[in-house]
Regions:
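Conserved, mostly hydrophobic/aromatic
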Residues: 21, 78, 99, 157
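Active-site mouth loops of central-metabolism enzymes
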Residues: 77-89, 129-138
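N-terminal active-site wall of soluble small-molecule enzyme domains
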Residues: 64-75, 84-96, 112-124
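Catalytic domains of carbohydrate-active enzymes, especially glycoside hydrolases
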Residues: 94-110
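Alpha/beta enzyme core
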Residues: 83, 96-97, 118, 122, ...
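Short beta->alpha linker loops
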Residues: 32-33, 110-114, 135
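An N-cap/entry alpha-helix motif that binds or orients negatively charged groups
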Residues: 1-69, 174-194
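Hydrophobic faces of well-ordered beta-strands that scaffold small-molecule active sites
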Residues: 76-79, 104-108, 127-131, 155
Length: 194
């Protein structure tokens, strides 16, 4: 069987829907509460139009720039996504390596499965670390020290962890801080082992 032809994000979404266990797919492809922000973000992206330029010299075009003093291939970065390792073994390492190959920053989530040290051991380029600001200051300081030691080039502060947003699909799927192994989840995991 040949690999599917991927031409856009929707193709990737459909591929993931069939290859990834439902609870993990829903985690990545949903938001909290009513998902109104998630839907608004998608709608805002649909409003962005690329403008074609004609009759101009494109011989020396380049997206290269600097972000916080670091040379990058284009002005984008991989945003922090918690628990990427749920979707693929060593998921964060794979994403960090891909970002490195493309010359863009990778941001490791505080909620990642791979550690800060794992990413540093498997990449050469500096990466960014997303830091949730929490009450336990000693824990925060230890995370910052680990990020420095792992050559993180930036801390991306996240301030919205005052309370966890209720993610309705995660609740339905039994995916929580302590996942509930329901029969439906176990069957889904067994049939989609990626």
């Amino acid at each position: 069987m040949s690999a599917p032809v991927i031409t856009n994000i929707e193709d990737l979404r459909e591929l993931a829907k069939h290859k990834v266990p439902r609870m993990f797919y829903d985690y990545a492809d949903s938001g909290s509460w009513t998902e109104s922000t998630y839907r608004a973000n998608e709608a805002d992206f649909q409003k962005i139009k690329l403008r074609q330029r004609v009759a101009v010299d494109i011989e020396k075009r380049s997206l290269k720039t600097k972000m916080i003093g670091i040379d990058v291939a284009m002005p984008v970065a991989i945003a922090p996504v918690g628990s990427v390792g749920m979707h693929s073994a060593d998921g964060e390492i794979k994403v960090a390596r891909a970002a490195e190959r493309f010359g863009i920053p990778f941001t490791l989530s505080t909620m990642s499965i791979c550690s800060i040290e794992d990413i540093a051991a498997h990449t050469k380029a500096p990466f960014w670390f997303q830091l949730y600001v929490m009450r336990d200051r000693a824990f925060i300081e230890r995370l910052i020290d680990r990020a420095k030691a792992a050559r993180c080039g930036a801390l991306v502060l996240t301030l919205d962890l005052q309370i966890f947003g209720q993610r309705h699909k995660d609740v339905r799927n039994g995916l929580s801080a302590l996942p509930k192994p329901t029969l439906a989840n176990l069957i889904n995991l067994a049939t989609k082992p990626r």
